[in-house]
């Protein structure tokens, strides 16, 4: 492998952690990894690769014909008509070289000043494409944050963006990496160009492109298997994973992919968020475009997992991440680190790392969001809108109830027996380490109604677009969420996660004080009434009720919520810094209290194991300490839909490794104390918004049951 030190070049904003080269063991493990990635079908065939190149050539000729047509229609002189040109660029996974079979190709059409987006791109070009027999499934999205047209050309999926440059002629050798190309460009053009500029810059900033590609393929596959690959759901998308992998490649420039994967988990499991990830020092530029800078922009201080793009204007590519999704990803990084350490002693293999996360076994309680529409086209539009808003439900629950965590599933589910309908699910559980009280109530009616009001404010809403939100127990999950539509007869056994859960249960049940508390809670609960679970028996009444638009008689609904550790502990100042951020770091200290009607009783405190730390070498010089407080309200548009008033604390720029919670079971979802959340009888709202039918709202009541009752259905 070529060393980056052969020419004295340094990559990134800090010195590498290690310049060590590969060992024979690394070569073997990397070959095993590459074979595994091939066996699971992550590489396209040579025939498909050739077909993609042919399709891109056809698309380039289409846009060149289009630009000649509109130039002639607008009466340009003969010279400009002769030189009229448009050009196709690629970006995303295809440009990075990590796309798989059947993946979309992200493309950008760059056109001259006289070819407008509204009238020409979404006008004449859209008309031309619609009349071509080789073009199918044409879906223009002119109102998107980054306007695009999606379609298939000869069976290959294309996402086509448009950038209108203030040039009369687009040269065939146009270089998009020059900042001057952004001068006098409109905002939508800047955003459209950003994909290509960022992708190309990533490839320039990694020491070895082939090692980067193999590692990124691995991490993308791992993230999808573990359910943390989705920008819209609050996790990380393709560009985010690419930036994180590129940073690891910079820190270990001579390492093979097996080491890069291992160090990925080791570094980011210990990373002290919200310290930002940079591939290069941010360029403030000379064009006056806004860049990510928490020293200047107060709202940038609210980003909890900033991963900054390397091309001007630098932006936070991960502003969608929430407290809950960050907690989930940190748990997954910890799990990955443990498995990679086990692999070094041959106690685990790549199959172990890529075990899919059993989402529908991880929780006892879920929120089910059902949507439907009148026809396929309406459902496609409605689905896209609802997916973009689901993150708001997670944020609202986090904001209103600081002790509850939401885990959104990144994909939708289709019930084949119900056409024009799909469902989304969120796991619910309570933070560990938060004092809890029997009988404590959480009125989530307002939260659900706020979310539904936001969704129903869709500007393209038409009758037939419906949404309902309800609670469902694990034992009542519909069969269509399981592979093949068949509910498994038992939970997963023999996996890394299940073994960790078993170990954790054994350690939990050995605690005498906890057992005493449990007995008291169970005896008090058994007096509550015939609807209470006794000895693990199911309630006689239904425990999965959907909050639809149809008025129904009130029912009690039980929701079990495991308690888990708070992630908000202060970092350990004695541990070596691994921060490489060239900026100071910020986070919010805003607080939100639960809506409670009854005073808390029998507060149970759960102790945590003493923290451990796993230090690694410093990779940057700590910066000066700075403290600042702000009190402002910000409107975040698409990032946070409602105004928030926060008291923001500016953290020390010296990054330290956060405490390691030894209570983890190898999964971000510890199985400890189990709570029962019961929905109390509710009244119908006085007024209903669109849709016109009124909807019930749930009140959730918490009461504790057995600590050892963690696998009950």
Swiss-Prot record:
Mg(2+) 2 binds at residues 104, 106, 159. The record marks 320, 391, 396 as: Interaction with RNA. Mg(2+) 1 binds at residues 104, 106. It comes from the Eukaryota. It is an enzyme of class 2 (transferase). GO terms for biological process: flower development; leaf development; mRNA processing; negative regulation of cell population proliferation; negative regulation of innate immune response; petal formation; RNA 3'-end processing. Expressed in stems, cotyledons, hypocotyls, radicle, leaves, and, to a lower extent, in roots (including primary and secondary roots as well as root tips) and flowers. In radicle, roots and leaves, mainly present in vascular tissues. Its EC number is 2.7.7.19. GO terms for molecular function: ATP binding; metal ion binding; poly(A) RNA polymerase activity; RNA binding. The keyword Transferase applies. Pfam families: PAP_central, PAP_NTPase, PAP_RNA-bind. Keywords: ATP-binding, Magnesium, Metal-binding, mRNA processing, Nucleotide-binding, Nucleotidyltransferase, Nucleus, Transferase. InterPro entries: NT_sf, NuclTrfase_I-like_C, PolA_pol_cen_dom, PolA_pol_NTPase, PolA_pol_RNA-bd_dom, PolyA_polymerase. Disruption phenotype: Lethal. Residues 507-526 have a biased composition (Low complexity). It catalyses: RNA(n) + ATP = RNA(n)-3'-adenine ribonucleotide + diphosphate. Its cofactor is Mg(2+); Mn(2+). Its main location: nucleus. Binds 2 magnesium ions. Also active with manganese. One of its GO terms (cellular component) is nucleus. PANTHER family: POLY A POLYMERASE, POLYNUCLEOTIDE ADENYLYLTRANSFERASE. Essential protein. Polymerase that creates the 3'-poly(A) tail of mRNA's. Also required for the endoribonucleolytic cleavage reaction at some polyadenylation sites. May acquire specificity through interaction with a cleavage and polyadenylation specificity factor (CPSF) at its C-terminus. Belongs to the poly(A) polymerase family. Monomer. Forms a complex with cleavage and polyadenylation specificity factor (CPSF) subunit PAPS4. This is Nuclear poly(A) polymerase 1. It comes from Arabidopsis thaliana.
């Amino acid at each position: 492998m070529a060393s980056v030190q052969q020419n004295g070049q340094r990559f990134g904003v800090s010195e590498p952690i290690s310049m060590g080269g590969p060992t024979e063991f690394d070569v073997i493990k990397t070959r095993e990894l590459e074979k595994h990635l091939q066996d699971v079908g992550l590489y396209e065939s040579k025939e498909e690769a050739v077909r993609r190149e042919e399709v891109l050539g056809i698309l380039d000729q289409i846009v060149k014909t289009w630009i000649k047509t509109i130039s002639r229609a607008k009466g340009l002189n003969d010279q400009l008509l002769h030189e009229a040109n448009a050009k196709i660029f690629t970006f995303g996974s295809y440009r990075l070289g990590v796309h798989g079979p059947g993946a979309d190709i992200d493309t950008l059409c760059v056109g001259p000043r006289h070819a407008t987006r509204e009238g020409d791109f979404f006008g004449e070009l859209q008309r031309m494409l619609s009349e071509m027999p080789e073009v199918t499934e044409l879906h223009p999205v002119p109102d998107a944050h980054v306007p695009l047209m999606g379609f298939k050309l000869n069976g290959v999926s294309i996402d086509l963006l448009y950038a209108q440059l203030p040039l009369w002629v687009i040269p065939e050798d146009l270089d998009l990496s020059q900042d001057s190309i952004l001068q006098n460009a409109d905002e939508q053009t800047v955003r459209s160009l950003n994909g290509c500029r960022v992708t190309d810059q990533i490839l320039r900033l990694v020491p070895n492109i082939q090692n980067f590609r193999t590692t990124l393929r691995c991490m993308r596959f791992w993230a999808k298997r573990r359910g943390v690959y989705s920008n819209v759901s609050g996790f990380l998308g393709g560009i985010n994973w690419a930036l994180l992998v590129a940073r690891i490649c910079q820190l270990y420039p001579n390492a093979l992919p097996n080491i890069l994967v291992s160090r990925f988990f080791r570094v980011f499991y210990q990373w002290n968020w919200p310290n930002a990830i940079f591939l290069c020092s941010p360029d403030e530029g000379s064009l006056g475009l806004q860049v990510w800078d928490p020293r200047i922009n107060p709202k940038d201080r609210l980003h909890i997992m900033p991963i900054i793009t390397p091309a001007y204007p630098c932006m936070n590519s991960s502003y969608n991440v929430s407290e809950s999704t960050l907690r989930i990803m940190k748990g997954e990084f910890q799990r990955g680190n443990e498995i990679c350490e086990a692999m070094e002693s041959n106690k685990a293999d790549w199959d172990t790392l890529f075990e899919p996360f059993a989402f529908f076994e991880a929780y006892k309680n879920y929120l089910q969001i059902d949507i439907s529409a009148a026809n396929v086209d309406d459902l496609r539009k409605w689905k896209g809108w609802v997916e973009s808003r689901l993150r708001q439900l997670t944020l609202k629950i986090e904001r209103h109830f600081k002790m509850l965590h939401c885990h959104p599933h990144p994909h939708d589910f289709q019930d084949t027996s119900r056409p024009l309908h799909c469902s989304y699910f969120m796991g619910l559980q309570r933070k560990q380490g938060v004092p809890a009280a029997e009988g404590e109530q959480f009125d989530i009616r307002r939260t659900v109604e706020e979310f539904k009001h936001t969704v129903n404010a869709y500007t393209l809403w038409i009758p037939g677009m419906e949404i309902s939100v309800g609670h469902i127990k694990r034992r009542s999950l519909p069969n269509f969420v399981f592979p093949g539509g068949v509910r498994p007869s038992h939970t997963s056994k023999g996996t890394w996660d299940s073994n960790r859960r078993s170990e954790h249960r054994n350690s939990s049940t050995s605690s005498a004080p906890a057992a005493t508390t449990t007995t008291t809670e169970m005896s008090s609960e058994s007096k509550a009434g015939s609807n209470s679970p006794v000895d693990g028996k199911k309630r006689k009444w239904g425990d999965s009720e959907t909050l639809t638009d149809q008025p129904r008689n009130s029912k009690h609904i039980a929701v079990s919520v495991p308690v888990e550790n708070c992630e908000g502990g202060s970092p350990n100042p004695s541990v070596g810094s691994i921060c490489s951020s060239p900026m100071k770091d910020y986070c919010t200290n805003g607080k939100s209290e639960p809506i409670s009607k009854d005073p808390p009783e029998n507060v149970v405190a759960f102790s945590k194991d003493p923290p451990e730390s796993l230090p690694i070498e410093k990779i940057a010089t700590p910066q000066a300490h700075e403290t600042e407080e702000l009190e402002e309200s910000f409107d975040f548009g698409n990032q946070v839909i409602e105004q928030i008033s926060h008291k923001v604390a500016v953290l020390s720029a010296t990054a330290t490794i956060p405490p390691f919670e030894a209570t983890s079971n190898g999964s971000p979802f510890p199985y400890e104390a189990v709570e029962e959340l019961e929905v109390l009888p509710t009244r119908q709202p006085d007024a209903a918004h669109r849709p016109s039918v009124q909807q019930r709202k749930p009140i959730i009541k918490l009461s504790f049951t057995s600590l050892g009752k963690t696998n009950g259905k």
